[in-house]
Amino acid sequence: NTLPKSKSSGKSFWCNLILLLILNIYMMNSKHCLIFGGSGQIGRNLIRKLTKNNYRVTVVTRNIHQKSYIIKTQANAGYIDIVEANIFDEKKIRALFKKTDICINLIGILFEQKKGNTFKNIHSIFPSLLAKLCKEYNLKHFIHLSALGINDAVDSEYAKSKLEGENNVLKNFPLATILRPSIVYSVDDNFTTNFMTLLNRLPIFPLYYEGKTKFAPIHCSDLTDTINHIISKNIYSKIIECTGPEIISFKELLQKLLYLINKKRILVPFPLPLAKFSAQFFELLPNPLLTSDQLRLLKYDNISSGKYKTNSEIGIPSVRYFEEEVKKYCYMWREGGQFSTEKYISKDLQNKIN
């Protein structure tokens, strides 16, 4: 004997089938983004936003076993693919362009390494390769992440390679949009987190160029909002300077971080010869805190030049302020953590208890 099939089970089957068909049609209409540098703070944030807006994403990584979990958890299943490849393996990279609508390059380095990771290779030759492939495969868009202040920093190898990369991109794919952000920060960065670690441990901290260098730090989420806007509004052939809502000197930045982690430290202006010597020493380390090239770069302000449109002028103003955002995650470096007793209990109350 068999049990009779209920009408409700039949209805649920057809409902599920219809929903599945609608989902497949929805995903078939989605655009495909190819992202290089997707495992970093900017890449992860961008993946979350693009996939929520029905973009399918392919992320290229050097080590799939190391980065797979970090990347896959940024999006729902079906919206993200991960490909392991060397970025200079043209045969493998070329195959990815056959099913791509938009290419986004977020790869960049702050210091050179011996095994091929030079400024020229990463910032100039690789973007040039991507731009040529974008043109060859008729991609709708290519978004390339560069850096702010590179026109002025003529004695910095980092800046020269970034500028050369921009020129190569526009030469090979004139429709490309180039973003020049100031310092990008978030809970996942290597900027504020490293500085707070050092300020937490060192009683004295050096000020290079008297701490007068100006920055316009932009939160990672504001930057990815800009990228998302550029894609959705089809903004082409532009250089866009991406800055935060405020200009802060290096000294002011350190003072804000010290206030947030509730520390008092002596900020000492470093003479240039001593700064150069310390940079040469740090270069001997695998991950140097400062290099000679970075020291040269620190001479120049990292703010909008006024020569190009900014993220605000294309309709996406930065809304996140440095101190307000860092306050959300700085407690990891503050004595007593998020619920520091001394911070929250008034002296009057402590006296009454005692």
Language model features: what each stretch is:
Residues 65-129, 133-136, 148-152:
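NAD(P)H-binding glycine-rich loop region in Rossmannoid oxidoreductase-like domains
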Residues 190-192, 210-231, 238-241, 252:
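Substrate-positioning beta->alpha
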Residues 208-213, 240-247, 258-262, 270, ...:
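Glycine-rich Rossmann NAD(P)(H)-binding loop
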Residues 273-354:
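A hydrophobic C-terminal alpha-helical subdomain
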Residues 33-55:
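N-terminal Rossmann NAD(P)H-binding glycine-rich loop of SDR-like oxidoreductase domains
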Residues 156, 179-196:
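Flexible, glycine-rich beta-alpha linker
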Residues 186-194, 230-240, 246, 262-265:
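Glycine/proline-rich active-site loop of Rossmann-fold NAD(P)-dependent oxidoreductases
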Residues 56, 109-110, 116-172, 176-182:
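Conserved Rossmann-fold NAD(P)-dependent oxidoreductase catalytic core, especially the SDR/UDP-sugar
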